[in-house]
Design a protein with these regions (language model features):
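Active-site-adjacent structural elements that line small-molecule/cofactor binding pockets in enzymes
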Residues: 1-287
Length: 287
């Protein structure tokens, strides 16, 4: 089985970002993702366009764009432009916008769950139609269909994504906390079971929040379990946490593939060296 890893990061300066893009491609990462948090992150399509200029094969995507505060035509225009200048490497990652601080940053009150879900579906479907040629004459994307990545855990949206998305990104994030940015963790394997079932066979990618190459995986899982308020046994099973020697990490990847069919992962920048070494050693391959 081939497992793939994507890198989730954002720039701190130009030279570092361009270097990261080059190194991620050379190491065999499947995609370079960047977040969208209006008011507290860089502009996703600007930094992805910069990465496109210094790479040739790595996919480039938003992870994930807040669909609640953007018009479909502007989303379609940005992603079509990225696909054009990257030679067909764009991925459109969309979410419903569950973080209150993002809505506050644009001077709007976050709607309730039902309204956000309704609006997300409307925006996502309109954007896909435009990318297919309905209402967006120029630019035209290189790909016949720009892959749509849905990021979220809402039950209704997972059912929708099962029939409309090309990839479902599970982050393990739960309720938004009082600061408007941080979230509770929903890392329980039982929750993953339910979400994967809702995905209905659409490929799933897990966002790994904790990653460590170590000879003492038990100690790492014990520490992380406290952070996530789950048991050590659950920490050792959940796809959002990975610890161990290269062979132990490979065994966990295989275990997650057997249980959930998950073979794609996104990791944050601190995991770069460990994942790059894993890719170089050959137990996993870019797919």
């Amino acid at each position: 089985m081939a497992f793939s890893f994507s890198m989730h990061a954002q720039p701190t300066d130009a030279a570092d970002w361009l270097d990261l893009a080059r190194r991620a491609e050379a190491a065999g990462f499947q995609a370079l993702y960047t977040p969208d948090h209006p008011g507290s992150s860089t502009s996703p399509f600007v930094v992805l366009a910069a990465a496109a200029a210094v790479t040739s094969t790595i996919k480039l995507g938003s992870y994930v764009l807040n669909a609640g505060i953007r018009e479909p035509i502007l989303i379609a225009q940005d992603v079509a432009t990225l696909d054009l200048i990257s030679g067909g490497r764009a991925i459109l990652g969309l979410g419903a916008g569950h973080t209150p601080a993002e809505w506050a940053a644009v001077g709007r009150e976050r709607p309730g769950v039902r309204a956000r879900v309704d609006h997300f579906i409307e925006v996502a479907e309109a954007t896909v139609r435009m990318l297919a040629g309905d209402g967006l004459a120029t630019p035209r994307p290189v790909q016949d269909r720009v892959p749509l990545l849905f990021g979220g855990g809402n039950t209704r949206l997972l059912r929708w994504a099962a029939g409309h998305a090309d990839l479902i990104g599970l982050s393990g994030l739960g309720r938004t906390l009082a600061d408007g940015h941080t979230h509770t963790a929903k890392f329980s394997p039982a929750v993953v079971d339910a979400q994967v079932e809702l995905a209905g066979g659409t490929p799933v990618e897990a966002l790994v929040h904790y990653f460590e190459v170590t000879g003492d995986a038990g100690a790492a899982y014990a520490k992380w379990a406290v952070d996530a308020e789950i048991s050590e046994a659950e920490a050792a099973l959940t796809p959002y946490m990975m610890a161990g020697t290269p062979s132990e990490l490979t065994a966990k990847l295989e275990q997650s593939e057997r249980r959930w069919g998950i073979s794609r992962y996104a990791v944050r920048r601190p995991a770069f060296d460990g994942v790059a070494a894993l890719l170089a050693a050959g137990p996993v391959t870019a797919s």
